[in-house]
């Protein structure tokens, strides 16, 4: 089977890579092409390891039989079954249940999402639903303690007892970013903690700039800039 792993945003890479790894480890007879959207992704960490392109024309010429997409849209004119791989768990987002008619199949994270999309499938009648889990969780499970030494090094160098990760959603309606900055500072002092912050790539730039500047003046806050993998 010819498979395209379609990455419009950088976070899609870590979501889809477990699929590449599974095919490679199992020696499955599939040919994989990655699409990396150059305007939003300035570097591809697996560039020397896999087949990839920045060209939609090359994707078309590849004649994929399946396209995996951790996003809401994909060019309708590309051949192959188009599969949405969900990229989070925020079911309360207002646009989570919108059917945009781009996909033939929705791969869901768990029973709650499956039941809702199965109901939508009955209403629309032009897509299928399959509960697969979320591939990015595979990496987390397999590497659960891989970076314990890195964590201890961070705590040792910062002189802190606890590490706290703050990774808010970008959605303006749901994010805590406008309200929580000073509370994070208090939490760091009360818990003798190092606050590690990583923002979604679609976060408003003014919020990113505000928190980056704030973190630069604090010894107990570490700002992870976009492009860095927060799972390490």
Where are these regions (language model features)?
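Short hydrophobic beta-strand segments
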Residues: 1-7, 164-167
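A short, charged/proline- and glycine-enriched loop
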Residues: 1-2, 80, 158-162
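Active-site and donor-binding regions of nucleotide-sugar-utilizing enzymes
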Residues: 4-144, 148
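Conserved catalytic-core segment of nucleotide-activated headgroup transferases in glycan assembly
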Residues: 12-24, 137-214
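A generic structural motif
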Residues: 25-32, 190-195, 219-221
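Donor nucleotide-activated moiety binding/catalytic core segment of transferases
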Residues: 53-58, 203-232
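Extended, charge-rich low-complexity interaction segments
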Residues: 59-75, 158-168, 172, 226-230
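An acidic- and aromatic-residue-enriched active-site/binding cleft used to recognize and process polar
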Residues: 111-112, 134, 200-202, 226-228
């Amino acid at each position: 089977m010819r498979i395209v792993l379609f990455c419009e945003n950088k976070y899609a890479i870590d979501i889809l890579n477990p699929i590449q790894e599974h095919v490679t480890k199992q020696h499955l007879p599939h040919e994989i092409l990655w699409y990396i959207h150059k305007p939003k992704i300035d570097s591809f960490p697996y560039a020397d390891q896999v087949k990839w392109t920045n060209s939609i024309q090359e994707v078309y010429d590849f004649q994929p039989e399946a396209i995996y997409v951790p996003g809401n849209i994909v060019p309708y004119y590309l051949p192959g079954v188009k599969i949405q791989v969900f990229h989070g768990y925020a079911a309360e987002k207002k646009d989570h249940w919108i059917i945009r008619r781009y996909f033939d199949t929705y791969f869901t994270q768990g029973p709650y999402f499956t039941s809702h999309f199965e109901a939508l499938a009955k209403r629309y009648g032009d897509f299928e639903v399959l509960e697969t889990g979320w591939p990015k969780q595979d990496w987390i499970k397999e590497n659960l303690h891989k970076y314990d030494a890195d964590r201890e090094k961070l705590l040792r160098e910062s002189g802190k007892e606890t590490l706290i990760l703050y990774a808010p959603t970008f959605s303006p309606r749901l994010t805590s970013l406008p309200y929580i900055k000073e509370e994070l500072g208090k939490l760091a002092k009360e818990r003798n903690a190092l606050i590690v912050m990583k923002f979604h790539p679609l976060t408003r730039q003014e919020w990113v700039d505000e928190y980056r500047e704030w973190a630069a003046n604090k010894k107990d806050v570490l700002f992870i800039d976009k492009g860095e993998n927060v799972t390490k």
